[in-house]
């Protein structure tokens, strides 16, 4: 009979907050009512806590849980990634009876069809979608689970500061050449002023309370609309000119993008309770600096609603 080494006492009797597995990839099929199924190859990170009295977790049980849950998905007509995370949490507590906390993070690439803005050429767009669940178990074995879903989308931003500097420089040069104030205004209203651009990465995570639904497609659309412009895999010349011009007509700081996402989240998800947790993050990959720009807000919908009144 094999000795259960994991169940023995450790040399150093200190509890650990998270022990588990990372970088576990699995193919899953999410069935949708009256729609084509979604095929994903997500990465899983799965953790439980470990008491000070136990040497280790039973590591093989965590990937075993994921396999069992994925197999059970075949029998479900409609299944969301947040529900998948919740089922994994419940199963983790069954397999790791010593655990009082469990956590699951799932993220992967989600493929969508897109059209170029002018020529309407079709291509594939890739976004990152995410699901996170955290469960706690009390002394009476009551389990409380919080779940979140979200997405990460790439877009383009145009810097307002550099654009304003070049606008002032253009005004000065036009005045030196004898143009009137009215002519200068007409000229500047007719052309796009140059600036430097960034590849923006917007992220939104929203809690999904019991009895409510949060559409990931809505989150993706909010992120897209909150930057200076969208990016596309396939652009012909007329499309490229349009994308660049429109982005320069809509310059945004990294802070502007984050605040616009917040405004749109509050408007779109007005049916969710005030205590719903929200995370909004914007990272802009700078083109003329070696660093990146960052803005974030972690809050509840109630707090955000009060600020936007």
UniProtKB/Swiss-Prot annotation:
Cofactor mode of binding and number, as noted: Binds 1 Fe(2+) ion per subunit.
Required cofactor(s): Fe(2+)
UniProt xrefs under Pfam families: GCHY-1
Enzyme Commission number(s) from the entry: 3.5.4.39
Residues at the site labelled May be catalytically important: 159
Organism domain of life: Archaea
Sorted UniProt keywords: Hydrolase, Iron, Metal-binding
GO MF, one example: iron ion binding
A GO biological-process term: tetrahydromethanopterin biosynthetic process
Catalytic activity of the protein: GTP + H2O = 7,8-dihydroneopterin 2',3'-cyclic phosphate + formate + diphosphate + H(+)
Pathway assigned in UniProt: Cofactor biosynthesis; 5,6,7,8-tetrahydromethanopterin biosynthesis
Subunit note: Homodimer.
Family affiliation: Belongs to the GTP cyclohydrolase IV family.
Function: Converts GTP to 7,8-dihydro-D-neopterin 2',3'-cyclic phosphate, the first intermediate in the biosynthesis of coenzyme methanopterin.
Name of the protein in its database record: GTP cyclohydrolase MptA
Species whose genome carries this gene: Methanococcus aeolicus (strain ATCC BAA-1280 / DSM 17508 / OCM 812 / Nankai-3)
Gene name linked to the record: mptA
